[in-house]
Design a protein with these regions (language model features):
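Carboxylate-rich, polar loop motifs that coordinate divalent cations or form catalytic acidic clusters
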Residues: 1-179
Length: 179
């Protein structure tokens, strides 16, 4: 944190002895939500919710119980939807949804049923609020489209020799295209 008055930075690091602090010092993504608080996705520490005004951390770690926590402690991408809920991309645990009103998680795992994410290693997320769609880039599973209203997934994969498909099944970033 930067202090404009002193010109100094204050570091926040993890401390195993401190239960209220950051769970891991390696932060892979940061999202500032519509309330001005920060959601920090960490490497093997899950998600940390940080209120900078009061310097309070809330930890969301991996859990064996779907409603209580993340499917994986490795969080690489996080986005907020128009309802203030979080969509969390994990490495190895697919896509996680956190409902801020009920404070419960829902996991979207690869291969779990017919309508699922194509791969568990999520590398990119993009939210289209007008269409209520989440675009999900994966490592080796191509591109996924999740219609939030219906819960339906569509998979877009590379097909060898077909130039009309993705050039690769590795999608690391997603940006909107404007005509």
């Amino acid at each position: 944190r930067y202090n404009k008055t002193t010109g100094l930075f204050q570091n926040h690091t993890s401390n195993d002895m401190q239960n209220e602090g950051l769970t891991h010092s390696s932060i892979w993504c940061i999202v500032k939500d519509n309330q001005g608080t920060l959601w920090l996705g960490t490497y093997f520490g899950g998600v940390n919710y940080f209120n900078p005004e009061y310097e309070i951390y809330t930890r969301y770690k991996a859990s064996r119980n779907e409603k209580e926590g993340l499917s994986s402690p490795v969080v690489g991408r996080t986005i907020e939807d128009k309802n203030g809920n979080l969509w969390i991309g994990t490495e190895g645990g697919g896509l996680n949804f956190y409902n801020r009103r009920t404070r419960e998680f829902k996991w979207y795992l690869a291969g779990k049923g017919y309508n699922s994410i194509s791969h568990s290693n999520v590398k990119a997320l993009y939210y289209d609020p007008a269409k209520e769609i989440i675009w999900i880039g994966t490592h080796l599973g191509g591109l996924n489209k999740l219609d939030i209203r219906t819960g339906a997934f569509t998979h877009y994969l590379m097909e060898e020799g077909n130039p009309e498909t993705l050039p690769s099944n590795i999608v690391r970033d997603i940006a909107p295209y404007h005509d």
